[in-house]
């Protein structure tokens, strides 16, 4: 009985060594990261950014839908109002140490202000450095939707003008004409 157990043990060890040596000469899966580009899937969800509309204004209207949609509660913002009546976030903060990059904030945003980019290099030495303020998140361009302007598309009144009378604004849609 003991000899059979010893033979099984030696056989198991030899089989393990054989598997290790067979993998030693197989092609490597490891990439030398900075020198070799890492493949990211086309729909990869990475760093979150805040975009601007084509006119250069912030797209975010501080509706708070992104913060409500976030399952971990890593988004916080405070609404404020400009002189012309347009809302904007007084502060907009995302804690990336809690963010799970699910993309629900991007889906909830009616103005396409929040967009997820394929950037994945977010390593920091201190946890406090992963809390991004509005200035850190705001980019200079429109992101994925270069022609979209929420105020132009929504038909909201701008500066006290009736809907459809502002420059470059589409005429309001008659909802009753859409009925079958």
Swiss-Prot record:
It catalyses: a quinone + NADH + 5 H(+)(in) = a quinol + NAD(+) + 4 H(+)(out). Gene3D superfamilies: 3.30.70.3270. Its main location: membrane. Residues 161-180 are annotated as: Disordered. [4Fe-4S] cluster 1 binds at residues 60, 63, 66, 109. Residues 48-80, 90-119 form the 4Fe-4S ferredoxin-type domain. NDH-1 is composed of 14 different subunits. Subunits NuoA, H, J, K, L, M, N constitute the membrane sector of the complex. This is NADH-quinone oxidoreductase subunit I. It comes from Aeromonas hydrophila subsp. hydrophila (strain ATCC 7966 / DSM 30187 / BCRC 13018 / CCUG 14551 / JCM 1027 / KCTC 2358 / NCIMB 9240 / NCTC 8049). The lineage of its organism: Bacteria, Pseudomonadati, Pseudomonadota, Gammaproteobacteria, Aeromonadales.
């Amino acid at each position: 009985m003991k000899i059979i157990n010893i033979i099984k043990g030696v056989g198991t060890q030899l089989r393990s060594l054989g598997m290790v040596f067979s993998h030693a000469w197989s092609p490597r899966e490891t990439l030398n990261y900075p020198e070799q580009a890492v493949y990211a899937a086309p729909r990869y969800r990475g760093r979150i950014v805040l975009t601007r509309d084509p006119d250069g204004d912030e797209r975010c209207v501080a509706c708070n839908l992104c913060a409500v949609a976030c399952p971990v509660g890593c988004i916080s913002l405070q609404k404020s109002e400009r002189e012309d009546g347009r809302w904007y976030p007084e502060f907009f903060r995302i804690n990336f140490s809690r963010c799970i990059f699910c993309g629900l904030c991007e889906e909830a945003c009616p103005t396409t202000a929040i967009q997820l980019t394929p950037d994945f290099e977010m390593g920091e030495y201190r946890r406090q450095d992963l809390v991004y303020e509005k200035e850190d998140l705001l980019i200079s361009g429109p992101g994925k939707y270069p022609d979209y302007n929420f105020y132009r598309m929504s038909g909201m009144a701008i500066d006290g003008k009736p809907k459809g009378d502002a420059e470059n604004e589409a005429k309001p849609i008659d909802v009753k004409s859409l009925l079958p």
